[in-house]
Regions:
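N-terminal glycine-rich phosphate/pyrophosphate-binding loop and immediately adjacent elements
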Residues: 1-112, 116, 121-125, 129-132
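Conserved redox-cofactor binding core of oxidoreductases
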Residues: 56, 62, 72-73, 99-102, ...
């Protein structure tokens, strides 16, 4: 390809794809490069009974373990944070579980509230319109009204709890603990965000 481009995006994971989406209606020529090919959803580990075992081999979160031809080693020996990445179209969203937590106002004031690190130079309210746009774009489903979280209004109703979730919810209620189902980016109705 020798055509000139206005914007080059390296990586079509969550961030790169969001940037490409936000620029799609401009007249700019956008090129998005990805390391790796398309993954077949039928091959995802969650489709088989041995899904847990696959996370220790061909579907490991670390390229150091996975060793696919598209992978490259990452030295994280001196880091308390171990790498989670995937080299394919969609990047690490291939490993993504659709859990969609939003930051809390307190996350922006860690120095003030907890005496560690620095407070952010902006607050939660400044980012609220962008959080809401992102929720609409991604198609977030969730339950509004959590008293311990910011007032969010996901565009779709929540996922059903399921048997395990109901059992855990009952046990947590018995302990008197607060719990709330997490927002997800799994559609619960027809949606075009």
């Amino acid at each position: 390809m020798n055509d000139p481009v206005d914007v080059l995006i390296i990586g079509a994971g969550a961030s790169g794809a969001a940037v490409a989406w936000s620029l799609a209606e401009t007249k700019m020529h956008i090129l998005c490069l990805e390391q790796g090919g398309w993954m077949n959803p039928a091959d995802y580990p969650s489709t088989g009974r041995d899904w847990e075992a696959k996370f220790y081999g061909e579907w490991a979160t670390s390229p150091n373990v996975r060793g696919r031809p598209e992978d490259y080693p990452i030295n994280d020996d001196n880091s308390p944070i171990k790498v989670v990445n995937f080299n394919a179209i969609g990047g690490s969203t291939v490993m993504y579980t659709a859990h969609w937590p939003r930051l809390h106002p307190s996350d922006f004031k860690v120095k003030t509230l907890d005496g560690v690190a620095d407070d952010w130079p902006i607050d939660y309210d400044a980012l609220t319109p962008f959080f809401e746009e992102n929720d609409r774009m991604m198609g977030v489903s969730g339950l509004s009204g959590d008293p311990r979280s910011p007032l969010t209004h996901p565009p779709m109703p929540p996922q059903p709890l399921g048997r395990s979730g109901a059992i855990i919810g009952k046990a947590v209620n018995k302990l008197g603990w607060h719990w709330w189902p997490s927002d997800t980016t799994v559609a619960t109705m027809d949606y075009e965000g």
